[in-house]
């Protein structure tokens, strides 16, 4: 059996070597010739898997080690009888850590108290839902916009217009959809960007085209009061350099790139494939994850809560390093920039999640206990 897989998927041998030959290919280079004789195709979001790629091939199972599925033609899969699986929630915590690290950096730059801001989360799925839980756990004022969930479940949701009018911080966590009433392509167009509150922060760690990049560039040039954090780009791996230069933080689509998240994605696809072939899963991710480099932190009960929160978040993940690495690649030609975008992702250093961090509090501090619980860290 032949398994064609994106070369950047971790733990391929550990999970899939027992099933057959693994052929590793750069994700953007996977084409019809590559998959023609493949039985299984394993991809990430950089590979569009559709009729043009698969028709006439032997592929019967497609797995994407990502939360999103906008790069998969699910209608064609159903028509062709191809079983598929994504990895819902696999990197959700990594994205939450990215947003938290970004908030800590913005607060330091702007000199603001994060407790006094109003937060708007657009999209309450795997990522947005976890972020909402953390922010509310910290006792912060959070408003949520998710029209599909509101229609299906009811609940305490607000409109997009209310988010824009009332929120100081807006974090985007929607899938990318191009048609229908809930289309998210260019959800933030020039009109909505112009309507942002004075001094608002906009964070996009969802999909690049959710924000009109050209419009955002023009609005940032006009309104110096706004701050933008972008991890995703409309034409990636090509990046609008002039837009990146206007962002307070700019990174190459690595928000969810925690080691835990990447390996969790492979584990979920492995489980799905075992279900597909009717065999029990014999390999467990917990047996493969290495020990985190930062495993335990001690805080004195007298520690300032705002300082402790920033220290815990940025101790696990500080986006400024990724921002600096990314900006260095923007000095080359367009071709060099495109290549560097993928190199940064392929060679991304090991990064762990805050949920694996043990926190010891010396003495009694309800405020610190609240922070540790909200972050999902382990109190010891």
Curated annotation (Swiss-Prot):
Gene3D superfamilies: 3.30.1370.170, NAD(P)-binding Rossmann-like Domain (3.40.50.720)
Disulfide bridge positions per record: none
Reaction equations catalysed: 4-phospho-D-erythronate + NAD(+) = (R)-3-hydroxy-2-oxo-4-phosphooxybutanoate + NADH + H(+)
Binding site for substrate: 45, 66, 257
Annotated EC: 1.1.1.290
Pathway, per record: Cofactor biosynthesis; pyridoxine 5'-phosphate biosynthesis; pyridoxine 5'-phosphate from D-erythrose 4-phosphate: step 2/5
First-listed, main subcellular location of the protein, grouped into a coarse class: cytoplasm
SUPFAM superfamilies given in the database record: Formate/glycerate dehydrogenase catalytic domain-like (SSF52283), NAD(P)-binding Rossmann-fold domains (SSF51735)
The keyword Oxidoreductase appears for this protein: yes
Record: active site: 207, 236, 253 (proton donor)
Molecular functions per Gene Ontology: 4-phosphoerythronate dehydrogenase activity; NAD binding; protein dimerization activity
The entry's keywords: Cytoplasm, NAD, Oxidoreductase, Pyridoxine biosynthesis
Subcellular location: Cytoplasm
Pfam families: 2-Hacid_dh, 2-Hacid_dh_C, DUF3410
Function of the protein: Catalyzes the oxidation of erythronate-4-phosphate to 3-hydroxy-2-oxo-4-phosphonooxybutanoate.
NCBIfam families named among the record's database cross-references: PRK00257.1
The name this protein goes by in its record: Erythronate-4-phosphate dehydrogenase
Lineage of the species this protein comes from: Bacteria, Pseudomonadati, Pseudomonadota, Gammaproteobacteria, Pseudomonadales
Protein's gene: pdxB
